Amino acid sequence: MDILVAHNFYKQPGGEDQCVAAEVAMLKAHGHNVIEYHCHNDATEALGRMGLASRTIWSRSAFYELRQLFRTHRPQIAHFHNTFPLISPAAYYAARGNNIPVVQTVHNFRLVCANALLFRSGRVCEDCLGKAIGWPGIVHKCYRNSLGATSAATAMLGVHRAMGTWRRAVDVYVALTEFSRNKLIEGGLPAERVVVKSNFVYPDPGPGSGAGGYIVFIGRLSAEKGLETLLDAWRLLGRKPRLKIIGDGPMAAKVKEAAQKDDTVQWLGSKPLEAVLESIGEAAALMLPSQCYENFPRVVAEAFAKGTPVVASGHGAMATIISNGYTGLLFRPGDAPDLAEKLEIILADPITLSHMRQAARAEFVRNFTAEANHRTLMAIYEKALGGSNPEALRPVSCEW
């Protein structure tokens, strides 16, 4: 199959970028011809505020570049990942103008929330969910604490809602979990065209041993990731192993301070994927104490691949991905004493931990391998090719 894959890469590489790269590699390994179209957020600095806002709503350059690619290569499917801010929904119309079905993987909550997190002021927030215009987000400057940036993101959502883009220009939306699917539907996406396909890991890194005995956190060092809760819980523990924190972000100074005060806390900064996988495999457990809902962090699939159980906040997608007491443990979000109690369970009972390791690896083999993902993705492409969208735009020539 000939497939065009488009993605707007982030300034700070993260799990979403890795997911796209893994999916492209998996498609190529299965014999598909993949045409790649990329933008990178490093280019935003040269655009200026007005130029970036305009491109967020309708990127003329992405439209024309993609139109040319569609005409040259004639792919059977156009598969979009992140289109914000440099690709924009204009890309769908470039595909539609060439009668090419559109699949959109939704890696976050950007289509229903200006900051893509459903999170504000230290708490889960759904104030804009289902609104034609997300004015609460503008009032609170939810995206980058900027009125201009939030207004641009909100305008993009509102303009394309008014144009019917979300309803008519996309054949299939791919949510990463059932929880995320439900939130996207609450936000206005057509239920019959939102399907679920989880993240996966390719190639399979193989199980680790857990022999390191430490706890590891991997991710962006920011408030929504629950680092305050993790550090508070760590202070409540009696005898404790090492806590390795891998990543960078706005809370780096606070993490560094915690490491200076407690020699069991180690901040390792950002690490390449190979080192991250090794750290996960040797850990007793992976920590995911997020205050926000999360969607499907790739690091969870990586932990399961290595046979490492996950201790996570028991809300949002995590409550559906992690089987409590089987592939990991869930604690009450933001509750440091409850998290400390769950860590004590993990650390005190090697037999339970061994069973969890086996269960986590089995969950990976069952649901998160490249083979399982490829089967699901092919079914999604068949759905898109089968004309699953009765409201679909007819081929148009849009010259904005």
Residue ranges and their predicted role:
Residues A253-E274:
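Nucleotide-activated donor-binding/catalytic signature segment of Leloir-type glycosyltransferases, i.e.
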Residues L111, E126, G130-G206, Q266:
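Donor nucleotide-sugar binding/catalytic pocket of nucleotide-sugar-dependent glycosyltransferases
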Residues G281-N295, T308:
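Acidic donor-binding loop of glycosyltransferase active sites
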